Regions:
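Short, solvent-exposed loop/turn and secondary-structure capping segments
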Residues: 28, 52-56, 151-153, 176-178, ...
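Intrinsically disordered, low-complexity linker/terminal regions across diverse proteins
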Residues: 69, 219, 254-257, 276-280, ...
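Bacterial Sec-dependent N-terminal signal peptides
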Residues: 1-21
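Active-site-surrounding "flap" and adjacent substrate/cofactor-binding loops of secreted or lumenal enzymes
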Residues: 35-39, 44-109
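Hydrophobic/aromatic-rich, well-ordered segments within soluble, folded domains that form packed cores
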Residues: 30-51, 180, 184-203, 568, ...
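Short secondary-structure subsegments characteristic of cysteine-rich extracellular domains
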Residues: 58-80, 210-229, 499-505, 598, ...
Length: 672
């Protein structure tokens, strides 16, 4: 997950500033003038904002990035509320969006129905036998949940024009193996909350107290066994170790306790002849468990997985139990989001491009696409110049890097071709969960149907209304959805320094992902190919390890350190994004000069603008959760650790040896 913004070169060069004051860009109220840039730059740049925005109990983290997401959500709320109040023709996108939203808002009906909407399927799951387990797992994988493992259709890592079936580790409700294996107090608290949650769900569907307790313990036991065999998140950063190809016959021979042909048939796929198993040891454990677990234990595990998936779309009792573990225990949130936000998430995700098309028509200025392309082109030139001037890389590898850079596909705003939702319906006579499930199944069927088809490289991995951006190594593309192309990241009334420090860094960040510890293993066509000389690869790794060690040295809470290995790709992208955006900024008229605005030089405004992007308040629980599961560093480290490698940052604020923010030249890292 990555971030981005909109900006146009033409706009920026037209915004040259004279001495004076602007009310756009850097806001002095965001600063904490009781400290200094050389002591703690994050506190200096963001302390005022953090003080003015105490954490609302519905959030575990809230920052300027989240403010932007909230602005986008308010736009979506206005759009969807209007649709929900209209009489829309049956089968139209307006009808589907409006009706599914209204059903989520109908708390009276949801509470009166209780567990009733899922009981037919629960009875079906209760009938599973070991002989029919493959078909049952396939039933669950069609949009409901991912018991034991997960599967999906994606581009072949070594032949990006062809779709391939992947089998991957999953089945752990807490998301990460460490939540099952670590013994620190916070992790134990999370496990206890999860056990309590499972117990409640079983009682909600009629289990007696003692039976519910035993069933919950069975679920935790199975998931803990899966966790023991799971790859760590650090190990999962190495794609080469997760590319293990089997024919269907070879797959069956390797994991004989599961009928793979029956499983794939259950997914509607009779043409599976090549399968990639991403985590071999994990699937060995799954195969072992299928053999050794009692039928009753398998049933209880599958039943829990089903109820867990349905809980957010049922009565308040289910919602509150779900919130207690996944939000309160894991993240430190104190109250649930209002119902309208939760209800909005359904059409926004499960009818995403349909909502996105309506969103773009109403809120996205057509000229923004052109302006953004100009800015991306400018940043691409700056990165190309930096690659050409690298002292640690050989000419041969530089040529390959530049070929890849110049082959980037750029997607801006919204797709040229919209997804067709005409085959799925929303029926208000059915329950909310039944309708949500129909949408989820439609989505899963669409994904699985891509097997045997050429990779659709025009397809987007995010909806247009998403406040985010991404780089996809399999298509060598960078994408900036409409949702991120708005203030405060791109502000046409702000000066170049502020725009380059925000959106410019974001664009540079996405580009640098093509050359981070994962992206560098893919060529210009999106294939996993080694295009590096052996010596250059070693030099890159040496620099990356040095950067990773800087982050791992940081304590995030109590005695817990950041994980510089797990966050390596994002750290490299932040570092590269800063250097590339700064290089591009220095080509603007403002960047070439030294005119003060509000008492700050252009370079100071650039770095303040970057820091303000990451201003946020966050709970301790969320800090610990993100350190386990999020490949991005915490906001404070994205500012303080990244900037301490930049000599231009030291020069901008007069930071010298002896200041806490200073890093000696020999200890700094420069990769891209």
């Amino acid at each position: 997950m990555k971030k981005s913004i909109i900006l146009s070169m033409a706009l920026m060069s037209a915004l040259m500033v004279n001495a004076g004051s602007l009310d756009k860009g850097v806001d002095r109220n965001n600063l904490d003038l009781t400290t200094t840039p050389g002591t703690d730059f994050y506190q200096y740049a963001c302390g005022g904002w953090m003080k003015a925005h105490p954490l609302d109990p519905q959030y575990a983290r809230f920052g300027t990035f989240d403010q932007m997401a909230e602005s986008s959500r308010e736009q979506l709320k206005e759009l969807v509320l209007n649709l929900s109040k209209q009489q829309n023709a049956k089968g139209t996108m307006a009808q589907k969006v409006g009706d599914i939203f209204n059903m989520g808002m109908d708390s009276t009906r949801l509470n009166s129905e209780g567990a009733k909407p899922l009981m037919k399927d629960i009875d079906f799951v209760k009938g599973v036998k070991k002989a029919t387990l493959p078909e049952m797992v396939a039933f669950m994988h069609m949009g409901i949940a991912s018991p034991f493992f997960d599967s999906g259709v994606m581009a072949d890592l070594k032949n990006s024009d062809v779709n391939l079936m992947y089998i991957q580790q999953s089945g752990m409700g807490l998301g990460d193996r460490d939540y099952y294996l670590d013994e620190d107090a916070n992790t134990k608290k999370v496990r206890e909350a999860y056990l309590t949650y499972a117990n409640k769900l079983f009682t909600f569907i009629g289990y007696k107290k003692n039976d519910a307790k035993k069933a919950a313990e069975t679920v935790l036991k199975i998931e803990k066994e899966l966790a023991k065999a799971a790859m760590t998140r650090e190990e999962q950063r190495d794609y080469s170790k997760q590319y293990n190809i089997f024919t269907l016959e070879e797959l069956q021979a390797k994991y004989p306790n599961f009928n793979w042909k029956s499983y794939f048939s259950g997914l509607g796929l009779d043409n599976v002849n090549r399968v990639c198993v991403s985590q071999l040891d994990f699937m060995k454990k799954v195969d072992e468990l299928i053999s050794t677990l009692k039928e009753k234990e398998i049933k209880e595990y599958l039943i829990f997985k089903y109820i867990d998936a349905a809980a957010p779309y049922l009565s308040d009792a289910f919602n509150e139990a779900n919130f207690d573990v996944y939000s309160r225990a894991l993240s430190g949130k104190q109250v649930m989001q209002p119902r309208w936000k939760r209800s909005l998430n359904v059409p926004n995700t499960l009818l995403g491009e349909g909502v996105g098309q309506l969103y773009v028509e109403k809120y996205f200025p057509a000229e923004s696409k052109k302006k953004m392309k100009q800015l991306v082109d400018n940043l691409r030139i700056a990165l190309g110049e930096r690659i050409a001037s690298l002292t640690w890389m050989s000419p041969k590898t530089k040529v390959n890097a530049l070929v890849k850079l110049n082959s980037f596909t750029v997607k801006i705003g919204y797709p040229d071709k919209w997804r067709d939702y005409s085959a799925v319906s929303v029926n208000p006579e059915l329950s909310y969960w039944e309708n949500v499930l129909a949408l989820k199944k439609f989505d899963a069927q669409f994904s699985y149907s891509q097997l045997g088809q050429p990779v659709d490289k025009d397809r987007w991995q995010m909806t247009p209304q998403t406040v985010n951006a991404y780089y996809d190594p399999s298509t060598n593309e960078i994408c900036f959805p409409a949702g991120i192309l708005q203030r405060p990241y791109f502000d046409p009334d702000a000066d170049d320094a502020c725009n380059y420090g925000a959106i410019g860094v974001v664009i540079g960040h996405e580009m640098t992902h093509g050359f981070d510890d994962q992206g560098r293993n893919f060529d210009q066509n999106g294939n996993m190919v080694d295009w590096w000389t052996e010596e250059d690869a070693k030099e890159f790794q040496k620099l990356a390890d040095k950067l990773g060690a800087q982050y791992s040295a940081e304590i995030v809470a109590d005695d817990v350190h950041a994980n510089g290995t797990f966050t390596m790709g994002e750290n490299i992208a932040d570092h590269g994004g800063l250097r590339v955006a700064y290089a591009a900024f220095k080509k603007t008229e403002q960047g070439k000069g030294n005119t003060l605005i509000d008492g700050f030089t252009p370079d100071q405004r650039f770095y303040l603008s970057y820091a303000n992007v990451w201003a946020a308040n966050i709970t301790k629980e969320e800090i610990l959760r993100r350190t386990k599961v999020d490949p991005h560093s915490l906001g404070k480290n994205r500012v303080n650790v990244a900037l301490r490698n930049l000599e231009t940052f030291f020069d901008a604020f007069g930071i010298k040896a002896g200041d806490a923010m200073f890093r000696a030249e020999e200890d700094r890292v420069s990769i891209w």
